Amino acid sequence: MDPSLLRDRELFKKRALSTPVVEKRAVPSESPSSSSSKKKKAKVEHGGSSGSKQNSDHNNGSFNLKALSGSSGYKFGVLAKIVNYMKTRHQRGDTHPLTLEEILDETQHLDIGLKQKQWLMTEALVNNPKIEVVDGKYAFKPKYNLKDKKALLRLLDNHDQRGLGGILLEDIEEGLPNSQKAVKALGDQILFVSRPDKKKILFFNDKSCQFSVDEEFQKLWRSVTVDSMDEEKIEEYLKRQGISSMQESGPKKVASIQRRKKPASQKKRRFKTHNEHLAGVLKDYSDITPGK
């Protein structure tokens, strides 16, 4: 080949190598997994917005028991509302019984289904310990049905005479209409004692028992110790004397769960045995004297 052509060829190669070249990157095709993940993300965002909308509706007070009309929670929610309403009206002094329709009207539950009404009439209200049935109507049933402050004072006096102690204030507030006025009107005829759990107990203040005791008798009383006796023995002694301990007014103690102790595993002791597998083969040569 002509040498001039070879020189031109080499020069062309050098110029081509020195010229910069920009390449376009290939756009990667989206895999089906990535597209499905994007769709899931969009669904989650949509669901989150709907959930936040429900939360805002609940906060605005638009949520009610009707949303749970097909569940058991709706039934028991209606029952709880009825019992609370009957208790409130009893505390106001409205102690006359009402029909089921009147109760549903006053609690704004006239739109409940026939199954719920039947359940309230035949099971829920009849078997509720706080509701009593009077001639086909329903009334609140407190632990102590008190009409006025005189009835309260007689009840406390009766408890004191029988050695039953006091009565919880919350039980009195439940059964006595306008209880705060009645308790305030009794004044020093009753006594208040607060329990460790901050619940108050009312006692009858027997003024006939207010007398001075000689100091010598007080010292003798304080000198008697019961440290050597447990509570069961003290309670048995009080019962023999006709005195009952006031257990109902005290705070209930939760019984502690006793854990079963795992029996200690007794490992069998192993003794070393030497050449036990050769017991029938070995011989004793201790009696043979070695030859000279």
UniProtKB/Swiss-Prot annotation:
Gene Ontology CC entries for this record: cytosol; transcription factor TFIID complex; transcription factor TFIIE complex
Skewed-composition ranges (Basic residues): 258-272
Residues that bear N6-acetyllysine: K75
Biased composition (Polar residues): 51-63
DNA-binding region range list: 67-147
Molecular function as annotated in GO: DNA binding; RNA polymerase II general transcription initiation factor activity
Family annotation (InterPro entries): TFA2_Winged_2, TFIIE-bsu, TFIIE_bsu_DNA-bd, WH-like_DNA-bd_sf, WH_DNA-bd_sf
Chain positions found as Phosphoserine: S62
Residues recorded as bearing N-acetylmethionine in the entry: M1
Keywords: Acetylation, DNA-binding, Nucleus, Phosphoprotein, Transcription, Transcription regulation
Residue ranges of the region described as Disordered: 17-64, 245-277
Compartment annotation: Nucleus
Entry's Gene Ontology BP terms: transcription initiation at RNA polymerase II promoter
Family, similarity comment: Belongs to the TFIIE beta subunit family.
Subunit structure: Tetramer of two alpha and two beta chains. Interacts with FACT subunit SUPT16H. Interacts with ATF7IP. Interacts with SND1. Part of TBP-based Pol II pre-initiation complex (PIC), in which Pol II core assembles with general transcription factors and other specific initiation factors including GTF2E1, GTF2E2, GTF2F1, GTF2F2, TCEA1, ERCC2, ERCC3, GTF2H2, GTF2H3, GTF2H4, GTF2H5, GTF2A1, GTF2A2, GTF2B and TBP; this large multi-subunit PIC complex mediates DNA unwinding and targets Pol II core to the transcription start site where the first phosphodiester bond forms.
Function field: Recruits TFIIH to the initiation complex and stimulates the RNA polymerase II C-terminal domain kinase and DNA-dependent ATPase activities of TFIIH. Both TFIIH and TFIIE are required for promoter clearance by RNA polymerase.
Protein's name in the database: General transcription factor IIE subunit 2
Organism: Mus musculus (Mouse)
